[in-house]
Amino acid sequence: MNAFFDSFKNHFLISMPHLDDPHFEHTVIYLCEHTKAGAMGIIINRPSNVDFTELADHLGIQIHSPRLSSEPIYTGGPVEAERGFILHTTDKVWSNTLRVTDEVSLSASLEALEDIAQGNGPDAFRITLGCAGWDAGQLEAEIANNDWLVCEADLDVLFHTPSDMQFTAATRVLGIDMTRLSPDIGHG
């Protein structure tokens, strides 16, 4: 077994055209963790049919920041689909916050949602339900199978690009026009 390991933590996974899994088709995933034991990420470009008001009502949280009322909640992936995750800038952290980089953190607490609802949250954030997960070697096999393009994450794409434009914006980070790629794969 090869002892060399490259972590793709703080990278985007961009689904390839032939990937027809309904959970991951036409998605951009931000990888929060990637070790030899597996990987965990959040789909960033799939708004759900739930907005912040509905989530806050369900959790008994009062919203004091009017701009949040229609803030979409995103489908972060098929794993733990009922659990909330918040990708956010590191200007605000909580006791259970996982610092991914110096600029990006991941939180999953009611306290974080309450602070956001009060208008005391981080400068930029994305709230999701669920995440994506891979067992040891699974993500590497999918990348070797050409299911994913991988590039370093871009904060502007992550937090400031509308979800319907994130797929194209992420591919531009790589300098690729996905409309020119064939859905067929091969290794020659």
Swiss-Prot record:
NCBIfam families reported for this sequence? PRK00228.1-1
What is this protein's name? UPF0301 protein Mmwyl1_0539
Gene3D superfamilies the UniProt entry points to: VC0467-like
Domain of life (superkingdom): Bacteria
HAMAP family, per database record: UPF0301
- Protein family according to the UniProt entry: Belongs to the UPF0301 (AlgH) family.
The cross-references to PANTHER family, in alphabetical order and at most eight, read: UNCHARACTERIZED PROTEIN YQGE (PTHR30327), UPF0301 PROTEIN YQGE (PTHR30327:SF1)
Q: Which GO terms describe its cellular component?
A: cytosol
Q: Name one Pfam family in it.
A: DUF179
Q: Which organism is it from?
A: Marinomonas sp. (strain MWYL1)
